[in-house]
Amino acid sequence: GIRDDIDAYIQKTYPTEEQRKAVSQYARSLQASLLVDLENKITVKAATNTTSRAISCIFKKVPSGNSPNGGSVVEEILGVTTNTKQRLLQYIALDKALDGTVISSPSGDVCDESLFTMPDQRL
């Protein structure tokens, strides 16, 4: 799921339901990616593909991919998600686990309009 602090940030920052859904999709995928088994290349790549879809959804639903704060939505959510040393180190380890892999740009419907839920695990 989405951490309470990130959900509150999204609710406060993004003015439309469509934008909140897109940003929430990214926040969920990013949070889930921090919990994958980094030794399992298949799950690492699957988590990254899910995050890539969510980023594409942001650019589809949020004008220019910019937040009302004037920054990049992706950078803002990444910043609030990796706001502790443990979370940042986990994100860096995930990035390192992706070394040498190729990630394709997602195609088709990149936005998950349903309010799907993932296990509520948090770092």
Residue locations for each model-derived region?
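Calcium-binding acidic motifs and repeat modules
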Residues: 4-123
